Amino acid sequence: MRVAELTEPLASHPSALAAPDASAGMAAMEKRVAEYHARAEAFARALRKPPFHAETVHRLRTHLRRLQAYAEFLQHPIVAARLAQSVTWLSRLRTLDVFYHYLRRRKAPAKDLRRVAWALKEEAMMVASTGRLEAIRSMLAKMTLARIRRPVAFVENRLAALRGETSEHLAAALRKLSPEATRKELHRLRLLVKSLRYKEEIALETAWADPHRMMAFKRLQRTLGDYCDRDQFRRLAKKMNLACRSEIKKEYRQYHEKAREAVRKLGPPEEPASDLR
């Protein structure tokens, strides 16, 4: 996969041959986002008291990220920031849960499993006792589609600009990477790719859609996500002084190289970002 796969002309895709209809596009987007919102509310309601189901936490965070991407697309920075904060509130809970199940699959020593299980239990109790889930439910109840809706002409302009903005943001991010991309650089790139993918996903049923590019972003997000997970596991293992930390560190290095290789295959592009259309 190269930058061209993520920035090639929209006309190369069959969906682009249809005459754009802004009203229909807006209706399709709102239908999709309404489903995201309904699911986010359902998952938030399901998380009442510990122990929390891991998949429910994961899906809630995913749909909050999708709603954040929609708020960014409609240029509602305050709403987007609140949604991003909600995701952050649940980040450590999600990480510890994924780490615990990762250790179980690796048949880690019982002592290591107990330490992580205890940390997970404490984090779940903290999330429950600080009212974070209540705050998320309240925020979602107030964040109706009607309150953040934009005029049809505004949405049409945003859809028309989506390709150019995506190309510019991706190209700029790649040019900022050091020759051997660092942990922080890869983490920032992953968050950007995730946001770009969700924006593409939201527009999937419109005449501006590009399924090919959306799937390319999804593959890149998965590669970077696998690496970022191993990075978090490595740091947790060191902090908790787990017996299996050396094995985790070795695996981390392997995933770090995979992520770097994926980025090297992308570019960086030689052309100015404004030319990547």
Annotate each predicted stretch with a short phrase.
Residues 1-277:
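Function-determining surface determinants
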